[in-house]
């Protein structure tokens, strides 16, 4: 079905080929579950074995085996909210009810023992499971044991791969796979990753899947040029070498591209949402079509098989929210299998068709013992036509993208304090604290229509609602934990609106205390900014010593903020006290308009490490200097906008939530000059730039800071002229970059990008802007032989280098047309999402030392300190223990190359611990890219580790007993992985290695 003729609620290229518009066809109710006695009798039949490859069906080694995969693709929010999809509400928007799909599938599987089905989205399945009776649950467990109901992927959602951070990916996969492990044991453990709908595929995602223990990956969306080449060269299946640092085969993943995205073949969609004809076998009927369908299928299977290297091929039989009447699907598949296989006897057909699963198909490929080609880059950007690059969603809904990243930060703080404080965090003086709601909400946000920004507006609003609801019980947990660890029960306040300078307590109280929690494994020095009233203030550190402070008037406001530097220990907190000075009005530092006097035309800000100079005529940044490394780089930064395409003579494709398609290659400047104001205090220097009524920026240097901070504010983007606009921040330099630039992959490893180039095929570039855009999750940089300019982001954005020495990041977009990919509404964001604030951190370094700066600063950007306020004067938590104003959960800091990725409660007496080497091989010219050894025995101060078990990345298998299928790449044999030592709690981390542990602990009595 083409992009301009698809049923409502079907993404172009996605589900529902041949589907009728929902709501227009009559549909039978799914059959009820058979009586329990019948089910138990059926399941007691001989031949039921433990789930695993041994439960796979028999194949014919001398025939073409067509593996039919019955499946449903259930978006965890898209056109409807998660709840609306589960319960089947608002079927006028899209006919979809997940609870009925699962009811119907289970019922139909029990009718015929050869039938198989896979399910993916655990966010839905877990909800359905908890609504079932014990008897039904046992029936399902038996189906899983027999391999007839099989889970693929197993994450809470099928996450996006462009706008997601690797930590959040790991968390959501852990949540879903833990449910399966707790519910079904090893029988329910998925063996393949199933990412059939994400709009492009990242290398880091493949690396994580390999480290999670998956044997292979199946996906559906592949660039149309890439797919054509792979079909011709039999390259749809290969080994993906997904890490440049981890030794093969640690991050090697067998990868298979599905032949029809994830849809059934043309004419073979037998769902109530489809309009294809069912099998009619009665030759007397004028509708008789059985012979025609069988012949069509044989031709189809033979043609498809020619694109693959073995005598096995796979067909997906299902699509978006299908199988609500599973009997309709399975009855026709039964007939297809019977009639096609009958041709083997009737006329010597060499095609064998069978119910199968992706895992069973993969098993047959593995047994073929072939040598496979190797891929080492990624699958971005994705295009499904010459002018249809799916690179717009890298930047869509920037406010939601930032809220998701903030929530990841807060969830890690919540998890850590729950681990450090022990059971007291969950039940304490502030009520019942719980990290689970935010963990689940964050998992939902990783869905490929959530953080991607590709849902309807009301669904995006619901995603934000889920996050907000998850923050509440985490705040209770933080209060309980901080009270226990500090020894003082305070009236804690959480100011969620500090980004817009709103915090009622700090703006009204004469005295208050500020608790700053540091989630990193090293001490940090951090500048605190709090909105305050028009008074003078004195700030004291945990020892009672007065620390420097400033009051700064806010731009475009009569409000003001208090600034003071805080030092916070590793994995711990410091409590500072703030007091008004009676009778003293503040000496507030107001922004000063730039002088027009000829002898004062230098506009610059500077600290000990960085100097930034601005053009006094235009107000634009024009030069950056690293004083420590004696580097000076002319760099011009300004805001531009692309005029969004509404279609032209080359293509009717418009820019939308998914698609980025500008009208012209050259963007327009928001303004050629900025009205500027200068702020200089002992703690901070700022240049406030006002480009227009809807675009402004503060360029900032704090004392001691080694990067330049650009805090931009964009919106509401004006569209009254009838043009959608896509706003970028662009940096132009004199660096000779030779068409190269570099972006991160999900916040971890770095990939080299070359303009107008793809490593695995000769690109025919049809969109010189959109076709060169890539996801930027945490950083983008350009460099020559000496200097490197890096920009760190505070959320996922799209970015590129469209000419040598230049790089750009898209910060916001507002569009007037729907791009024809199923959402059915333009990306207008008429609510608060129109006004967005964010930060870019700019680093200038020598190439050989740049990694130290951007790695350590990016870590700080993802896990920033959590600020909690209180009036002070709280009651003691322990009557016999004095309160403390400083605490560290570590007895010694982690080395700079080691990141504490996860510290979270697993059960009542067990913690989940992940430690990560955050540098790549050869990335640092010093020793930060070297292996590092840690002793975990007495590392933590709040608890003692009594027993330690190492697991796979998602903690669903012991590492020592986990195994994966072995493949032979054409690069030569890979060495057997050497076992990682744990002796008894001393571990070594190799570059880019993550090691995961379940630690039995005993908490200290008073923390």
Swiss-Prot record:
Its EC number is 3.2.1.24. The active site is at 197 (nucleophile). Keywords: Disulfide bond, Glycoprotein, Glycosidase, Hydrolase, Lysosome, Metal-binding, Signal, Zinc. Zn(2+) binds at residues 73, 75, 197, 448. It comes from the Eukaryota. Processed into 3 peptides of 72 kDa, 41 kDa and 12 kDa. Residues 1-30 are annotated as: Disordered. Residues 1-10, 19-28 have a biased composition (Low complexity). Residues 1-50 form the signal peptide. It is found in: Lysosome. Its cofactor is Zn(2+). It is an enzyme of class 3 (hydrolase). It catalyses: Hydrolysis of terminal, non-reducing alpha-D-mannose residues in alpha-D-mannosides. Disulfide bonds join 56-360, 269-274, 414-474, 495-503. GO terms for molecular function: alpha-mannosidase activity; carbohydrate binding; metal ion binding. Glycans are attached at residues 134, 311, 347, 369, 499, 543, 643, 649, 690, 764, 927. One of its GO terms (biological process) is mannose metabolic process. Binds 1 zinc ion per subunit. One of its GO terms (cellular component) is lysosome. It is linked to Defects in MAN2B1 are the cause of lysosomal alpha-mannosidosis (AM). AM is a lysosomal storage disease characterized by accumulation of unbranched oligosaccharide chains. Belongs to the glycosyl hydrolase 38 family. Necessary for the catabolism of N-linked carbohydrates released during glycoprotein turnover. PANTHER family: ALPHA-MANNOSIDASE, LYSOSOMAL ALPHA-MANNOSIDASE. This is Lysosomal alpha-mannosidase. The lineage of its organism: Eukaryota, Metazoa, Chordata, Craniata, Vertebrata.
